[in-house]
Amino acid sequence: MVQEFVDASVRAIEAGLDGVELHAANGFLIDQFTRDSINQRDDKYGGTVDNRLRFMLEVVDAVCAAIGAGKVGIRLSPTNNVWGIKDSDPGNTFVRAVERLNTFNLAYVHILETKPDFESPEESKDYLTPLLREKYQGNLLINGGFDQLTGNDALENNEADAIAFGRPFISNPDLVERFQYEKPLTEANSTTFYTHHAEGYTDYPTMDMSR
């Protein structure tokens, strides 16, 4: 299984991409090894935090060896519980994860976590990004409901080295220019997400610069 990640990464570089992002978030395979609600293994890949991180680290190590650590990023979603997949102690698990990832000198670690309303102590205590920022020594990207204003605020407050945008890019192929010229954004149609047709993928217009 590790070799499949390597093969895909090598093909991506051969195709001309600048790098790859390992998807260790959102309940997909690597995330399933990481979280104790679904990882019930009793071998070296289950049980302790380090055992549950073993598969992730094997993948990272192998891909870095194949294409170079500077071309590898990884995405984590510490508190994004999807499909019932969660962790009993995400703080401990994901702090340990970024501590172990420090040894690889990756291009970046990408954290998906919605920033809470800090007027709500209950919500803010579960927000792990500040702690992960403290523990991770490399470039940190964050993602989770940011817009241009809140993204700039996060950068000014040194919460991350960069902000990643997902949904806004779906419906705004010229998102960078819209931010640059402070133009309104087109709202994405979520009913076209994860479909097999062109609608929602290629039909969002760019802005009219004459307006």
Where are these regions (language model features)?
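Flavin-dependent oxidoreductase catalytic cores
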Residues: 1-211
